[in-house]
Amino acid sequence: MKTQATLLLALLIGIPVIAQEDHSEFIEGPFASPQEVTETCLLCHDGVDRDIMQTRHWNWLGNEFVNSEGEKMMVGKQNLINNYCISLNSNWSRCTSCHIGFGWKDDTFDFENPNNIDCLICHDRSGSYKKSPTGAGMPDPSVDLVKVAKSVGKTTNRSCADCHFNGGGGSGVKHGDLTASMLNPSPALDFHMGKLGFTCSDCHAGENHQILGAGHGSLAAGTNHMSCLDCHGEEPHRKKVINDHVNAVACETCHIPTFAREEPTMTWWDWSTAGQDKTVPLDEYGKPLYDKKKGDFLWEKNVVPVYKWHNGQADSYQPGEKFNPEQALELNRPGGTMFDESSKITPFKLMRSKQIYDPKNNYLILPKLFGKDGYWTTFDWNEASKIGMAVNELDYSGEYDFVYSRMYWPINHMVAPAKSSLKCADCHSQKESKRLNWEALGYKGDPMKVGGRAK
């Protein structure tokens, strides 16, 4: 390949290719496939493929841990269930449009082939690179691979936004604190990014492509955390009385008083109403309230978080795990209590849903949604359940119903300016606090009156 010859020549005559930020003089193409782009990248970036293959972004799994049954486990997007589009397995080609690889269309994907790594999805600086929404991670056919490869450099906010701002199928669907409004936020929306010019990588960059930050897979293992205190220290305030809260209250609790402040976020998804031919007007924010493929939705803006004690860990519902359908199923359960000194009162987005389950086996159904035989094409829940459960190697009784579920999503972004943070009276006042339910948190009343965990 012409490009390979150019790069090899550069290496032989001592040009510092790796340190060279402008790649345009080394990249020539043409490229018959995106894998050829990766092959070219690895000619100089030797060993990077081995690093990437150890990451959560590549494997969609967190660290190994031992569960309450004494079993070793690794969990992540590969095997966790949510109450949005439910499950990866049998729906690969749609879900893996956000994978940092090429061609993960079924369970035969080769995680050991370095040429399957997509360097461009994170390092494109042309602004023109995009994945095909249903192409199993392959680039959209319109992408000019040579142009994009010549542009590569350090990651940008858009690098992260393309996937993380659009989780669940669109901006604000999954994350209430990560939406399109965060691409160029005002200081009022996010002080660090809007006022100080922070990028995602300023906080999240780790070593060897190990991006910092605990998603659901990391929460299960209790690893890969980062904290405001990493930069601000244990006594970030001038007043001691406020610093006394740091050991029991997460920084985000006061400094992110609400989320989805400029763009709404989805808070309810009812799969049981899907399949109907009806027209429902858009809501006050211009968001859909109904989709035949997916059912009814509810969107909210300027949302007050739900607060729970959290110690950095969480238990998650596992495929095939039985539950009581008379109660709302919690798909993840943030760990921590008032009596656990590693726990802090922490803000979450609560996502509520009504999703499909097997009433005879009393566990969730993982339906096939995408593809010619998926529910989004056939509108046949029974067939979609049969196919999806077979792929997941779980028994399907032939009966289905719908159950209420809840899922907690940590709130870490949209840090407001200090003047907009919560004040003492927002939580402690003569009247009953409308923000914090002290009894639900384990207190007998307002801890300012009855005592708490402050130093």
Model-derived segments and their meaning:
Residues 1-5:
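Positively charged n-region of N-terminal signal peptides that target proteins for export
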Residues 6-14:
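Bacterial N-terminal signal peptides
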Residues 19-156, 162-225, 229-243, 345-352, ...:
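Sequence context of c-type cytochrome heme-c attachment sites
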Residues 224-332:
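Repeat-solenoid scaffold signature
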Residues 246-249, 343, 419-422:
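Short, well-structured alpha-helical interface segments that form or flank functional binding sites
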Residues 289-334, 338-346, 351-355, 367-389, ...:
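Long, compositionally biased charged/polar accessory segments in the mid-to-C-terminal portions
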Residues 416-418, 425-434:
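Terminal low-complexity/disordered tails
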